[in-house]
Amino acid sequence: MQHVFIIGSRGLPAQYGGFETFVEELVKHQQSSNLKYHVACLSNTEHETHFEHLGADCFTIKAPKLGPARVIAYDMMAINYCLKMVKEQRISNPIFYILGNTIGAFIGGFVKKIHAVGGHLFVNPDGLEWKRSKWSKPVQAYLKYAEKCKANQADLVISDNIGIETYIKNSYPTAKTRFIAYGTDTQVSSLTAKDQKIRTYFEKWDLTEKGYYLIVGRFVPENNYETAIREFMLSETKRDLVVICNHEGNAYFDTLRAKTQFDMDERVKFVGTVYDRDLLNYVRENTFAYIHGHEVGGTNPGLLEALGHTDLNLVFGVDFNKSVAQSSAYYWTKEAGNLASLINDVDKQSDFKALGEQARAIIKESYTWEKIVGEYEELFLHEN
């Protein structure tokens, strides 16, 4: 039996972002009976208690509330508890898979302990976290140093994007790397235009099928909301811009409003978050075009979902995005007027089925969870 300890996500069941969804899908689509997953779960109330989720052994870690440093303490406590389990249960050849770079600067001592019990350390750097503008300069410097420490000391660095793997290879030549993509759900929405749920939602926001452009994603500056909204407002389209994000109570919302005055354009509609997956898929499938502005990171889950559900995708042209969407999308830059011109061009057209078919073919070939989980299981069972 190969035991894999997964550390660095908030845990299961998945309720948050990319890492949590990845872990959920990894255990949900488990194919081999020779694998046993142990998943750290951040808790505010319980410590070192166990529960089972989709066959995985989940354990809670009650990390002290230290502000941004809490995640570092969480990872440290989780690793120590996993080491304790390995010793008590006499587990041989365990794999410790750490997601993210937060603990990186302190990884050296843990590498020795992991190797001392016959274990291997695999890490996933989570894109270029240190480049995110939400971090202060000191935090960015720490994250860059943490990335360096983990890349140079891990037994294997797993990247979910070819661009990230290339960056790791170029930046840290001694690092051993492996590319395994992120996955996505390809299931089409079961809802139809006649369903009451759809009509209620569309009437609430005064929307019509194919009558809107769409943005979905974390509400942070590096996702280029300012450029996308400013350029949309410059365009001549009569369609709306629907923005699905966590803007409520976010200071960036007021900053963005002051910079762009989007509240003066009735086409721009911030509609909050949508947690109903079936509804979100319908909204994606019936948008005229999806605008993807993510600039930092690896394979973005939102881009994969767009390629799987939307025919026309207008994507910010960085290497990370191009390596995924390839020729199935149109690309834009931050140059003034570039995206507005692209919107004006596509707005006059109507048939983008060929692009959509190409995008879905890319997803089916390279990004289904079944394929991704199969690659991870092959790695876990044979790499060490």
Each model region followed by its residue ranges:
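Conserved donor-binding/catalytic core segment of Leloir-type glycosyltransferases
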Residues: F5, R199-N223, I229-E236, V242
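N-terminal strand-loop element at the rim of the active site
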Residues: I7-Q15, H29-P68, G163-S171, E248-Y252
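Glycosyltransferase donor-sugar binding loop
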Residues: T45, T184-D185, V216, R239-T255, ...
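An aromatic- and histidine-rich active-site surface loop
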Residues: I72-K84, N93-D126, G298
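Membrane-proximal helix-turn-helix segments that form the acceptor-binding/catalytic region
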Residues: V139-V157
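A short, active-site helix/loop in glycosyltransferases that binds the activated sugar's phosphate group
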Residues: N152-S189, Y376
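Acidic donor-binding loop of glycosyltransferase active sites
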Residues: Y282-G298, D311-L312
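Conserved acidic donor-binding segment of nucleotide-sugar-dependent glycosyltransferases
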Residues: A329-G337, N344-S350
